[in-house]
Design a protein with these regions (language model features):
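Pepsin/retropepsin-fold aspartyl endopeptidases
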Residues: 1-142
């Protein structure tokens, strides 16, 4: 969906520990913590970003802090880890923890892992070859 030159996609963010247990057969899919969110594709962002309340609800592991360039300038940010799914593609990525109420973002690291290219003219994502194994993913998406 294109809104004023922006590309928005429906994405599902999963708790990576729950998701790993599911792929190993130790957890049911319905027990995997996840959030379906309308997310802005941001080709100027390296990593995805989620509001801190969503990070908390999903129980995403926090891996520390790093200096980062964000829309408001350079600042210290917290990094969490998540599994991200868009259509039939998935990625594992660090996620920048942003303030409550901010728009969820999908940056270039996750886009490239999923094999998506953004076309700014049409405002659409195009599928290329993903870095993540599709066969395993297809067997887990229901």
């Amino acid at each position: 969906v294109v809104v004023l030159g922006h590309i928005y996609v429906d994405a599902v963010f999963y708790n990576p520990v729950d998701y790993a247990e599911f792929t190993q057969g130790r957890r049911r899919l319905e027990d995997v913590r996840r959030a379906g969110l309308r997310s802005l594709v941001d080709t100027g962002a390296t990593f995805p970003a989620l509001p801190e309340d969503v990070v908390g609800e999903l129980g995403l592991p926090i891996y520390g802090e790093a200096e980062a360039e964000v829309a408001t300038g350079r600042e210290r940010v917290r990094l969490a880890l998540a599994i991200i799914q868009t259509e039939d593609r998935t990625a594992a990525s660090y996620v920048i923890v942003r303030p409550r109420g901010t728009t969820p973002l999908i940056g270039v690291v996750a886009l490239e892992q999923m094999g998506f290219r953004a076309d700014p003219v049409t405002g659409k994502l195009f599928k290329g070859l993903p870095l993540m194994p599709l066969e395993k993913i297809k067997n887990t998406i229901r």
